[in-house]
């Protein structure tokens, strides 16, 4: 991961790939902290944080995982250094025998604070969370839902409802 100025000048490297305490093993997604002073790298069950001003390592947090989850697909920063993490479970009919949530809010120590968006159907984990130019995050509609959510507050806030009327593809 590399940091460049708005003019395209190379500034510094941010972290490196590896198994060390200041390294990331994989990059599943990235986001900026709400104050944009930190870059957060999501790699499976860990968040590795680096300074956007110097590229220096800040901390690595191992996440407490829900029972069915084996790693997360997307990340967005939340208030007070919390993080929203999204998980799209594998397609398995047995997954619907128990309640399961797709969106979790974590504290800085990796503990679950809140759960949102009970899963209603199978989802595609493509472009789940989009960052806006003002460092807000938008979660695209999930499963059989037709709402886009902002993730900039402590709760997902419904922002846009998509309704194609009679042209909508029917749910199962």
Predicted regions and their residues:
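Short beta-strand elements that form the blades of beta-propeller/WD-repeat-like
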Residues: 1-2, 37-43, 80-95, 132-149
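Asp-box/WD-like beta-propeller blade repeats and closely related beta-sheet repeat scaffolds
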Residues: 25-27, 42-101, 113-121
């Amino acid at each position: 991961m590399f940091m460049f100025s708005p003019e395209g000048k190379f500034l510094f490297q941010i972290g490196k790939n590896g198994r060390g305490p200041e390294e990331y093993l994989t990059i599943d997604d990235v986001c900026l902290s709400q104050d944009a002073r930190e870059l957060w790298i999501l790699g499976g069950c860990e968040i590795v944080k680096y300074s956007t001003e110097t590229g220096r390592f800040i901390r690595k947090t191992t996440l407490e995982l829900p029972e069915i989850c084996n790693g997360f697909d997307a990340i967005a920063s939340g208030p007070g250094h919390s993080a929203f993490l999204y998980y799209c479970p594998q397609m398995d009919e047995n997954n619907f025998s128990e309640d399961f949530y797709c969106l979790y809010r974590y504290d800085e120590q990796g503990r679950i604070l809140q759960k949102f968006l009970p899963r209603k159907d199978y989802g595609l984990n493509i472009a789940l969370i989009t960052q806006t130019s003002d460092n807000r995050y938008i979660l695209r509609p999930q499963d059989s839902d037709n709402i886009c959510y902002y993730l900039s507050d402590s709760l997902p806030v419904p922002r846009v409802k998509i309704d194609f009327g009679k042209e909508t593809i029917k749910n199962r």
